[in-house]
UniProtKB/Swiss-Prot annotation:
The keyword Amino-acid biosynthesis applies. The alpha subunit is responsible for the aldol cleavage of indoleglycerol phosphate to indole and glyceraldehyde 3-phosphate. The active site is at E35 (proton acceptor), D46 (proton acceptor). Pathway: Amino-acid biosynthesis; L-tryptophan biosynthesis; L-tryptophan from chorismate: step 5/5. It comes from Sulfurisphaera tokodaii (strain DSM 16993 / JCM 10545 / NBRC 100140 / 7) (Sulfolobus tokodaii). GO terms for cellular component: cytosol. This is Tryptophan synthase alpha chain. Its EC number is 4.2.1.20. It comes from the Archaea. Belongs to the TrpA family. The keyword DNA-binding does not apply. Keywords: Amino-acid biosynthesis, Aromatic amino acid biosynthesis, Lyase, Tryptophan biosynthesis. GO terms for molecular function: tryptophan synthase activity.
Length: 245
């Protein structure tokens, strides 16, 4: 079974030309699903690297629709939007309708099961009712019964974050966390939100993850060494995934 590479990139980072180049080439190199971040007002569950990328693009990116349409034209793999439900409470229907019209496959709100736990099923129904898939985000702090329930209604895969925020090194036992959740989940299981190195990546795959979501590492590589270096990292991670396929 092919292990999934879910590649995250902030919309428009570091500029539109480089963003499109990274997206297209990453798909050629083996990305299975694209996760594109829309900068929120307050990125409370993102780490400093991704927050910095949000800040870099919000100074000039005023329209998310046009670049998303362009991405949809360029790639034929699933596209998931990652952003915060909190920002779209007043116009959620319009937002979801727009995503559906563009051809976006799914949406992932990392705050859904944390800040809107009492209403999450209602929001999941609303998302699906607009023709958009609902990808649910879970983590170690959620009880088993909620993870099981979320896995049954999550589309495409269940996202499991091993750390409370991205890009922050907090000691956790990646393999034991994933072994626990793997025993609960029948859905595809994608692990991210805090995989810090290749060792974490291999532990996740050995423990039964169906795929990994990588974002901070790519943004850091672009910032330090440029697009080509980040694409080399995509190729390297794809190679590790294929060892476990």
């Amino acid at each position: 079974m092919r292990r999934m590479l879910v590649t995250y990139m902030t919309l428009g980072y570091p500029n539109l030309e480089s963003f499109y180049q990274f997206i297209e080439k990453s798909v050629e190199l083996g990305t299975d699903i694209l996760e594109i971040g829309l900068p929120p007002k307050y990125a409370k569950y993102d780490g400093p690297v991704i927050r910095k990328s949000y800040k870099a693009v919000t100074s000039w990116l005023k329209d998310y629709i046009t670049p998303l349409k362009e991405v949809r034209k360029k790639v034929n793999i699933p596209i998931i939007i990652l952003t915060y439900l909190e920002d779209y409470l007043s116009n959620l229907d319009n937002f979801l309708t727009t995503l559906h019209e563009i051809g976006i496959d799914g949406v992932l709100f990392p705050d859904l099961l944390i800040d809107f736990i009492d209403e999450y099923e209602e929001y999941v129904s609303k998302i699906k009712g607009k023709g958009v898939k609902a990808v649910l985000f879970t983590g170690p702090s959620l009880p088993d019964n909620l993870i099981i329930k979320a896995s049954r209604i999550s589309d495409i895969f269940l996202y499991y974050g091993v750390r409370p925020t991205t890009g922050i090194i907090i000691p956790v036992s990646v393999d034991s966390l994933i072994t626990r959740v793997r025993n609960l989940v029948q859905n595809k299981l994608v692990v991210g939100f805090g995989l810090n190195d290749f060792n974490d990546l291999r532990k996740a795959l050995s423990a039964g993850a169906d795929g990994v979501a990588i974002g901070t590492a790519f943004i850091e590589e672009i910032e330090k060494n440029g697009i080509q270096s980040a694409l080399h990292l995509v190729k390297t991670i794809r190679g590790i995934l294929d060892e476990y396929s």
